[in-house]
Structure formats: structure tokens, C-alpha cells
A protein has these predicted regions:
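Interfacial helix-cap and linker-helix signal at transmembrane-aqueous boundaries
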Residues: 36-37, 67-68, 152-160, 214, ...
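Small-residue-rich alpha-helical segments with characteristic i,i+4
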Residues: 144, 148, 357-435
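Helix-loop-helix hairpins in multi-pass membrane proteins, especially solute transporters
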Residues: 61-198, 216
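C-terminal membrane-cytosol helix-exit motif in multi-pass small-molecule transporters
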Residues: 171-188, 204-216, 234-248, 483-491
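Cytoplasmic loop-to-transmembrane helix junctions
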Residues: 45, 130-137, 299, 387-394
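Hydrophobic transmembrane architecture of multi-pass small-molecule transporters
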Residues: 400-489, 497, 503-505
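A generic transmembrane-helix signature of 12-TM secondary carrier transporters
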Residues: 19, 81, 85-88, 103-104, ...
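Transmembrane core module of solute transporters
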Residues: 8-61, 99, 161, 198-200, ...
């Protein structure tokens, strides 16, 4: 597939750039949303900018993973890059919020192909004994990109304009495109096969319904509104139809027989659970720094750097030792560090020093990092190459689904706890200060408005925010404990050289 070691390194560089763009894109845009809304207006539509991207990414992952198994990795990776670049350029020139949302949907179609196919190409071009190190490298880039996004977004918005949050993808993508087109030569032969159109259609409708329900629920519409209930009902119905369709399809989008394999099934559960807990760290640690410590947006972004470094270390360790011991043993190290770090984060108060927060972040990042390199490898362990794309895209899909559900569920809980704490703190006081700040906590993030709040009032608000955030860190221990139990069932398998591959049963 690759003619020399030099070319191999260039292909890996091209894949890393693709992962860098797709993993960083949503978090880097989130930081710039305030500026974008101020420029384009239509505040009531800004949620669609994120929703449109996530919907098409999630819908595209399993479909492109399967298509890459059927017709080859290179053509669909290049397709994903081109669509992502076109979408990024269009986003940069958007003049209305509606235009930006449509262009983000286009961008998401490309993003849905980049991540799963990049990991699968690595499994194709490297022998088993080297895959661990390479997936560790790719996993480290994924973790770093996700955490680096908010910080980079803040700097780009401040020093240039929000347009460059999207334009920055263009030169990166062009370099990635050049490296893959020139140096990656796919040798596998792919016969023409029947595409599972019915499965693709029902999956897209199911995913779109679920994603819009999660993205719009509690924001555009209340959770018990007809719109949200209708979306959840649509998801349930089309997902059931999808399952029945896949059981009869010649080439199903998701091969459910793989879930009969213990290592594959447990890896998917862990991807979902780790995704659900990882996202709350990336979202709520910066909020804690800004609202509780009174830091700036840049300071909040920088505070994630220790977690980023910890995740890089964890991903590297997990990758290197895949051939030395079982996936289960390595994941036990992961979940132990992850649990300890999250537990320590749940004990924070407004008096907790930033040094201690930094140490907590390194520990939780180290535990989290293992999952970035181990779970994709475990998902394709001993699988026939023609199923790798589908297996890896399923893992990416479930991690992303976990992230979406996690930020929705934990975000709702945090908001409710914050309001309850404020009402309790200001109970019996005149003026309704608690209700005022429950409705507009943004005043805590702006130094000018924050300085105008009376000190005794500010102390109560800060304590309420601190309690609400540490409360969800404590609740996050539940899925982490479930992860620990799941790890027990992974078995003793590890990366072995010249191991017989498993075909469909």
C-alpha cells in the first residue's frame, strides 16, 4: 500500500491532519459562537450551527465506514476531505445564521468520513505489532485536538475574526489531501457490491431524529413538548426498522453479528461511557474556572492543557503496551486513574487551588487517554479487513453519541442544581437576587459585570455554581463504575502477531 518508510510517514502525517481538523472543529467553533451571534444576529437560531454539524457527522460515520469496506478507504477519505474543505470555506463566507447552519451540515458530511476511515487506514497499512503505537499517536492527536479547540478558538476570534475559525481548516486540509493523494496507494481489491440503501435511509432518519431531539430539547423546545416527543418517537420507530432491515441485508451498514464477540461488544459500551464522561470535563472545567475563579476565556482554555498532556501520555502508554498485556489489564489502569481523577474533581470548592486542579486534570486526562488508543484497536481485533471500517466507525459513532447524550443529560442536571442552590441561598432575602442570576448566569463570566455584584451576593452565586459543577462530576462516577464492571468482561485478548483473523459467523 505504501512503497517506503518515508512515504509511510507522510501518509500518517496526512491522516493526523485530518483527525486534527475533524476532532477540533466543534470545540473551536463553540468558543466563537458569541462573536458569531453578535455579527450575524438571529440568536434564536444559533443552536442550529452546532446541531447541523453533529447530525451529519453522526449519520455519516457508520455509512462511510461501511462504504470504505466495500469500495476502498482512499476514495472515501478523499471525498470526506474535499467535502469538509468546501464546507469550511463556505462557513467562512456565510452572511446569515441560516447559511452558516446549512454550510455546517455540509462540513459535517465530510467530518463523518474522516475520523473512522483514518483509524482504519492505520490498521490496514501497519502490521499488528506496530498498530498500538500508531493508534496511540492518532488517539493522542484526537484528545489533544478536542481539548485544544476552545483555546485556539478564543485566540483566533480575538486576534483575527470568527471567519478564520473555519478558514484555518483550508490550508490544513489541502496539505492532508496532497499527502494522501500522492503517497497512499491502496492495494486491496474491492469487488462491486450491493449498497444497503434501506439500512442507510432508516439509520439516517433515526440518527437525525435523535440528534435534533437532544440538541433542541430544553433549548428551543421543552422536553415534554410535542416536537421533542415526536422526534424521540421517530428515532425509536426508525431504529427498530433499521435493526430488522440490517438482519436481512446482504451487506449491512452495521454488522450486528460483531456484537456477539465479547471484546467488540465491551469496547463499544466503553466508548459510549467514556464519551459521555469525557465531554463534561471539556465543557465544565472551563466554566468552573471562569465562573468560580473569575478567570478569562483564555485562562479557562489554558486550564485544559494539563488534561490534554495527561491524555497524550495515557494514549501513548496504552498504545505501546498493547502487545505486552491484555486490553483488559490496560483498561483497568485507565479506569482506576479516571475514577480517581473524577473523584478528586468532585471534591473541589471555590477555595481549591489551581495547582490542585491542575494535578486532578493530569490524572483524569491520563486515565481517559488510554481509551483513545485501546478501544479502536480492540474493536477491530482479529477482524477480517473487509469489516474493519464498519467496526471502527461503530466505535466512533458510539463515542460521539455518548458525548452528545452526556453533555445534554449532565448539562440539564447542572443547570437545575445551580438554580436550586441559588434559590436555597437567597431564600428569605428581599429583591429576588437568586432568580435574577439563575436566569442569567452569564454575568459571572464577564469581569465588568462581575465586579458590580455585591461581594456577599457574589459569594453565594459562586458557591452555587461550584456545587452544581462538582455535583455532576460526582454523578459521572456512576458511568465510570459501570465501565469498570464492563472491563471485567473484556477477556484476556491482546494484540498478537500472525493471529488468525475472524470472519463473519
Amino acid at each position: 500500500m505504501v512503497s517506503s518508510q518515508r512515504n509511510l510517514k507522510l501518509v500518517v502525517a496526512g491522516l493526523l491532519l485530518g483527525i486534527l481538523m475533524s476532532a477540533m472543529d466543534n470545540t473551536i467553533v463553540a468558543t466563537a459562537m458569541g462573536t458569531i451571534v453578535a455579527d450575524l444576529g438571529d440568536f434564536d437560531k444559533f443552536v442550529w450551527v452546532t446541531s447541523a454539524y453533529m447530525v451529519t457527522v453522526m449519520a455519516g460515520m457508520p455509512i462511510f465506514g461501511k462504504l470504505s469496506d466495500m469500495y476502498g478507504r482512499k476514495r472515501f477519505y478523499i471525498f470526506g476531505l474535499l467535502v469538509f474543505l468546501i464546507g469550511s470555506a463556505l462557513c467562512g463566507i456565510a452572511e446569515t445564521m441560516v447559511q452558516l447552519s446549512v454550510y455546517r451540515a455540509i462540513q459535517g458530511i465530510g467530518g463523518g468520513a474522516l475520523m473512522p476511515i483514518a483509524f482504519t487506514i492505520v490498521f490496514d497499512i501497519f502490521p499488528p505489532e506496530k498498530r498500538g503505537k500508531m493508534t496511540g499517536l492518532l488517539g493522542a492527536v484526537f484528545g489533544t485536538s478536542s481539548v485544544l479547540g476552545p483555546l485556539l478558538g478564543a485566540y483566533i476570534t480575538d486576534w483575527f475574526s470568527w471567519h478564520w475559525v473555519f478558514y484555518i481548516n483550508v490550508p490544513i486540509g489541502i496539505v492532508s489531501l496532497f499527502l494522501i493523494v500522492k503517497y497512499y496507494h491502496e492495494s486491496a481489491q474491492h469487488s462491486r457490491q450491493k449498497i444497503d440503501w434501506a439500512g442507510a435511509f432508516t439509520l439516517v432518519i433515526a440518527v437525525v431524529s435523535l440528534m435534533f431531539a437532544l440538541e433542541l430539547g430544553g433549548k428551543e423546545y421543552s422536553w415534554d413538548s410535542l416536537q421533542i416527543i415526536g422526534l424521540f418517537t421517530s428515532f425509536a420507530l426508525f431504529f427498530i426498522v433499521f435493526i430488522f432491515t440490517e438482519r436481512k441485508a446482504e451487506e449491512p451498514i452495521i454488522s450486528f453479528w460483531m456484537f456477539k464477540r465479547r471484546l467488540f461488544a465491551t469496547s463499544q459500551i466503553l466508548a459510549f461511557l467514556y464519551g459521555a464522561t469525557f465531554i463534561i470535563l471539556a465543557v465544565f472545567i472551563p466554566i468552573f474556572v471562569q465562573a468560580v475563579y473569575g478567570g478569562s476565556a483564555k485562562t479557562a482554555g489554558l486550564i485544559l492543557t494539563p488534561m490534554m498532556l495527561g491524555s497524550v501520555a495515557g494514549s501513548a502508554v496504552g498504545g505501546v503496551f498493547q502487545t505486552k498485556t491484555s486490553y483488559r489489564n490496560l483498561m483497568f489502569i485507565s479506569v482506576a486513574a479516571y475514577f480517581a481523577g473524577m473523584l478528586l474533581l468532585s471534591t473541589m470548592t471555590p477555595e481549591t487551588s489551581r495547582v490542585m486542579l491542575t494535578l486532578f486534570m493530569i490524572l483524569v486526562g491520563f486515565g481517559m487517554g488510554f481509551s483513545f488508543s485501546l478501544l479502536p484497536t480492540a474493536s477491530i481485533h482479529n477482524l477480517d479487513p473487509r469489516f474493519r471500517g464498519s467496526a471502527n466507525s461503530t466505535n466512533s459513532f458510539l463515542r460521539s453519541l455518548g458525548m452528545t447524550l452526556g453533555v445534554t443529560i449532565f448539562g440539564t442536571i447542572q443547570n437545575n442544581v445551580f438554580k436550586e442552590e441559588l434559590i436555597s441561598a437567597f431564600k428569605g432575602m428581599v429583591g429576588g437576587q437568586g432568580n435574577q442570576f439563575a436566569g442569567d448566569p452569564q454575568q459571572l463570566f464577564q469581569s465588568g459585570q462581575r465586579s458590580q455584584i455585591p461581594e456577599f451576593v457574589l459569594d453565594k452565586i459562586v458557591q452555587a455554581m461550584s456545587t452544581s459543577i462538582t455535583h455532576i462530576f460526582a454523578l459521572a462516577l456512576i458511568p465510570i463504575v459501570i465501565s469498570a464492571v464492563t472491563i471485567f468482561f473484556m477477556g484476556k485478548e491482546r494484540v498478537e502477531i500472525n493471529k488468525t483473523i475472524v470472519k463473519e459467523s
